[in-house]
A protein has these predicted regions:
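Short, leucine-enriched amphipathic alpha-helices that occur as contiguous helical runs
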Residues: 15, 19-27
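Short alpha-helical scaffolding segments that buttress acidic/His motifs in well-ordered protein cores
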Residues: 104-108, 122-129, 174, 178, ...
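Helix-turn-helix
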Residues: 21, 29, 33-63, 67-71
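Hydrophobic alpha-helical connector segments
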Residues: 82-121, 171
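Amphipathic alpha-helical segments used for helix-helix packing
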Residues: 99-103, 116-145, 186-187
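Short Lys/Arg-rich basic patches
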Residues: 10-12
Length: 269
């Protein structure tokens, strides 16, 4: 259940106009179950409204969702672009990948810190970037193409050795990893797990979070040494599977010597 958020306050007190209640109900249901699982019947029941109210204020479920995303994401993305522009002006020599990644985090973190709506907002971001609905994916691509392109170019300048296609793949996985964390956890629980019981400031907290994702962008990608390790593990897995199959059928083959690298307790190099 969503806790510590501002979405249910209107519903609990019965105050607020119908349009606001519909938006709040939509946000809550979207965070909890995603776009496809959310029906107008669910929205109106939670908002204490009727279908005629949705048609009057928005016209459709799609238009209602578009309004919610615009209200929540447009200010965030404006702040991200402003921060990126300011940093590029201060550092014309170039920015590192971790710094660019930080510019995606910091405005969102500010909105979640010291704000009763913050945990809900962070989970909304996680759901938006991980929801598989074609409608959500299409909306993000159509409405936020400029900011996506702006940050992609910033990452490309920070990582000039990466082919653009590979950079796109790495960014996709990095954002998916972040989305999974944000969509599935209470923000305070996530912070607690990162600070490991220590008293740390915001900069230290964000640095740790960014350090978890930065290797997705910067780690070597399928080097010959990495491929060799995986090939040896695959060979060992096939050998183990054959041994298990032989044991199940009552036919035990002769014992084969384990690879030297495995006896020594290390990965092959």
């Amino acid at each position: 259940m969503l806790r510590g958020n501002c979405l249910s306050k209107t519903q609990r007190t019965g105050h607020g106009d119908t349009r606001k209640r519909l938006l709040e109900a939509t946000e809550w249901l979207f965070i909890e179950g995603g776009y496809e699982a959310m029906s107008l019947r669910h929205i109106t029941a939670r908002a204490g409204a009727n279908l005629a109210a949705v048609n009057y204020h928005f016209g459709s479920k799609e238009a209602l969702m578009q309004e919610l995303l615009s209200q929540r994401l447009d200010p965030l993305n404006r702040d991200r672009l402003q921060l990126l522009s300011a940093c590029e002006q201060q550092h014309p020599e170039g920015l590192g990948a971790a710094a660019v990644l930080g510019m995606l985090f910091i405005p969102a973190f500010r909105l979640s810190h010291g704000n009763t709506c913050g945990p809900a907002f962070m989970r909304l971001l996680g759901r938006v970037y991980s929801d598989p609905s074609p409608f959500i994916r299409s909306y993000l691509q159509d409405h936020y193409r400029p900011i996506s392109g702006r940050f992609f170019e910033a990452f490309s300048r920070a990582l000039p050795a990466l082919p653009r296609q590979e950079l796109g793949l790495r960014l996709h996985f990095a954002l998916k990893a972040l989305s999974g964390m944000l969509a599935g956890e209470d923000m305070q629980e996530l912070i607690t797990s990162i600070n490991k019981g220590e008293t740390i400031n915001d900069a230290e907290l964000l640095a740790r979070l960014i350090s978890l994702l930065s290797p997705i962008l910067t780690a070597p990608f399928g080097t010959p040494a990495q491929v060799k390790v995986i090939e040896q593990l695959l060979d060992l897995d096939r050998s183990t599977a054959r041994t298990d199959l032989a044991a199940d059928t009552g036919h035990i083959p002769g014992e084969s010597a384990a690879p030297q690298w495995l006896k020594e307790g290390r990965l092959a190099s």
